[in-house]
């Protein structure tokens, strides 16, 4: 629990794990005095709002059907749609290091377009120009100290974007966040990450109760307590634990549920066992965190594992593709030692969509020639020449160009690709690699120009315009991932008529069909310490196969097949809706079919 300040009024609610017999008297009461209207119709919550929330909850519960033992079934008729709160460490375009930021940039607007009320809660890593101070403050116990956090807010594409403001987030990052959300550089974590994300989880539980958001013409007032929280990856795995220990034990959020989404099982939040005391959770949760592995990082021996706790304490576990869901329970190799834990709870796989407004060849501002499925064959050669010129390769529209865009780390297989280039670079082909990540991998791709001056280029920079140029101008997109929960690069590529050449893992299996929309290389060895020569050969062999098809009738049909697909969030959002409705949260109903409430707006991401 937390202390809540709205305008200049503070009322205290004591945190802790034990329940109180007079819970109602401990609820935060925020009065009418000095109430401020701040921006976009947002104002501080007041006593009238609190009473209205309680009355609505009572009226709703009176309509709930009872089971034989008198407990509520959970479905109440009190409006349309669900109250959804996505909690996450990053959200595009404000903060993004990879697919997680893209997903929560695109899925929430799609859910809003389906008639649901949607909020996202993430850290405020920078002074975002389009997010404004709500003047709502809460005090949260983090470790041994009481920390004060503020909420910033903006309303975009039908979604309440809420940002948790605290120096623990701001002091880590300057300018665009790049890869410094989780650590000072790739592969290194901040030492206080357990405190940073503990604060995020607790603040996220307060946001639906204390923020009186009225920006939408469809919904107004606080979200209240009948909500579905969607926690994402290990950074938010404490949320179901705090929900139970700090709220439900005191009679609050009784009908709320938590869906826990695994975007990447490789990152689990493993800390030393002694760090459990920093989380301010009762001992009854220790078993959910308890974990033992054979590694010496961060400490040798027994540890706590945040993701394990998130899986066990949530009401539903979901991941980002059906095939990845099967891989996670297939054994310790793909499940990264949590396969047995996931098997106990079951898991649902829902393939990701993509942002078809940002990634649209017909309107893309980063390419010189816009096109659609009817003009792609005319536009591609022109865009290829522009791409070749931009990176300094010989300009020739007849040479097949292969692209790679991604993080330079073991998961994405950039080291396997670099090792394979020598095996096919003698063919009539050029290759362009764009990415940032581990320094040794950045150095590898930067050396390509020296090794193959007329054949290859490596750009170790964060370069959005070039990413769009490669996606549009390349003929093939290589995705050599050792494992890939879902993947967005192959979706972007197909949207632009660029044929994927991909490993057969995770969401790549679900989204790319061999011989119809792409070429599969087979599954790779997930051992990251070395490059498996067999995987190098798989890349070389499949590239040769793709180059042999280049320019053929079958190749042109594959381009058409790629571009004819609906890769938007519309279908995945409906699958998410079905899954979340099955949790039976009070007030939940199917949303009203429609489109996104607002078109893509120009986002002012960060101050210069």
UniProtKB/Swiss-Prot annotation:
Residues 1-24, 588-608 are annotated as: Disordered. Its main location: plastid. One of its GO terms (molecular function) is alpha-1,4-glucan glucosyltransferase (UDP-glucose donor) activity. GO terms for cellular component: amyloplast; chloroplast. It is found in: Plastid, Chloroplast; Plastid, Amyloplast. Residues 1-10 have a biased composition (Polar residues). The keyword Chloroplast applies. Pathway: Glycan biosynthesis; starch biosynthesis. It is an enzyme of class 2 (transferase). GO terms for biological process: starch biosynthetic process. Its EC number is 2.4.1.21. It comes from the Eukaryota. ADP-alpha-D-glucose binds at residue 96. Induction: Expressed with a circadian rhythm with peak expression at the end of the day. Residues 1-78 form a transit peptide. The keyword Isomerase does not apply. Keywords: Amyloplast, Chloroplast, Glycosyltransferase, Plastid, Starch biosynthesis, Transferase, Transit peptide. It catalyses: [(1->4)-alpha-D-glucosyl](n) + ADP-alpha-D-glucose = [(1->4)-alpha-D-glucosyl](n+1) + ADP + H(+). In leaves, flowers and fruits. Observed in all floral whorls at early developmental stages, but restricted to carpel before anthesis. Belongs to the glycosyltransferase 1 family. Bacterial/plant glycogen synthase subfamily. PANTHER family: GRANULE-BOUND STARCH SYNTHASE 1, CHLOROPLASTIC/AMYLOPLASTIC, GRANULE-BOUND STARCH SYNTHASE 1, CHLOROPLASTIC_AMYLOPLASTIC. This is Granule-bound starch synthase 1, chloroplastic/amyloplastic. It comes from Antirrhinum majus. The gene is WAXY.
């Amino acid at each position: 629990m937390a202390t809540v300040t709205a305008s200049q009024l503070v009322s205290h609610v004591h945190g802790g794990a034990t329940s109180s017999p007079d819970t109602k008297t401990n609820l935060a009461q925020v009065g009418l005095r000095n109430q401020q209207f701040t921006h976009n119709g947002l104002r501080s919550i007041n006593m009238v709002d609190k009473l209205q929330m309680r009355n609505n909850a009572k009226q709703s519960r009176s309509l709930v059907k009872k089971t034989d033992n008198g407990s509520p079934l959970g479905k109440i008729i009190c409006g349309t749609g669900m109250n959804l709160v996505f909690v996450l460490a990053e959200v595009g375009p404000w903060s993004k290091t990879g697919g997680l930021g893209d997903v929560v940039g695109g899925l929430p607007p799609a859910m809003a377009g389906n008639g649901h009320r949607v909020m996202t809660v993430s850290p405020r890593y920078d002074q975002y120009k389009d997010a404004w101070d709500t003047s709502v403050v809460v005090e949260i116990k983090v470790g041994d100290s009481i920390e004060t956090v503020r909420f910033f807010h903006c309303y975009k594409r039908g979604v309440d974007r809420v940002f948790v403001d605290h120096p623990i987030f701001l002091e880590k990052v300057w300018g665009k966040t790049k890869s410094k959300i989780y650590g000072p550089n790739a592969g290194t974590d901040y030492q206080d990450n357990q405190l940073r994300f503990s604060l995020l989880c607790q603040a996220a539980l307060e946001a639906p109760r204390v923020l009186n958001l009225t920006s939408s013409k469809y919904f107004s007032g606080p979200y209240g307590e009948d909500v579905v929280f969607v926690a994402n990856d290990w950074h938010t795995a404490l949320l179901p634990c705090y929900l139970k220990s700090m709220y439900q034990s005191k009679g609050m959020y009784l009908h709320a549920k938590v869906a826990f989404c695994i975007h990447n099982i490789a990152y689990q939040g493993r800390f030393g066992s002694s760090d459990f005391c920093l989380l301010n959770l009762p001992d009854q949760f220790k078993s959910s965190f308890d974990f033992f592995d054979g590694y010496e990082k961060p400490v040798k021996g027994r540890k706590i594992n945040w993701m394990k706790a998130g899986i066990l304490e949530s009401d539903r576990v979901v991941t980002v593709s059906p095939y990845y869901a099967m891989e996670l329970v297939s054994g310790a190799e793909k499940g990264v030692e949590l396969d047995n834990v996931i098997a106990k709870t079951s898991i649902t796989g829902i393939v990701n969509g993509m942002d078809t407004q940002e990634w649209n060849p017909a309107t893309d501002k980063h390419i010189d020639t816009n096109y659609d499925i009817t003009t792609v064959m005319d536009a591609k050669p022109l865009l290829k020449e522009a791409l070749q010129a931009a990176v300094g390769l010989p300009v020739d529209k007849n040479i097949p160009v292969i692209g790679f865009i991604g993080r330079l780390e073991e998961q994405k297989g950039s080291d396997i690709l670099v090792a394979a280039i020598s095996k096919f670079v003698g063919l009539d082909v050029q290759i362009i690699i764009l990415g940032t990540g581990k320094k040794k991998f950045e150095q590898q791709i930067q050396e390509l120009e020296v090794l193959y001056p007329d054949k290859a280029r490596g750009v170790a920079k964060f370069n959005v315009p070039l990413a769009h140029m490669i996606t549009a101008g390349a003929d093939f997109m290589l995705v050599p991932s050792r494992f890939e929960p879902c993947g967005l690069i192959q979706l972007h590529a197909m949207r632009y008529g660029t044929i994927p050449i991909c490993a057969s893992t995770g969401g790549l299996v679900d989204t790319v069909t061999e011989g119809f929309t792409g070429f599969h290389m087979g599954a790779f060895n997930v051992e990251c310490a070395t490059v498996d020569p067999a995987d190098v050969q798989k890349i070389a062999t499949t590239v040769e196969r793709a180059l042999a098809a280049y320019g053929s009738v079958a190749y042109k049909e594959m381009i058409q097949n790629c571009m004819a697909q609906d890769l938007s969030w519309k279908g995945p959002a409906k699958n998410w809706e079905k899954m979340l409705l099955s949790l039976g949260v009070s007030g939940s109903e199917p949303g009203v079919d429609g489109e996104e409430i607002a078109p893509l707006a120009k986002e002012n991401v960060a101050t210069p």
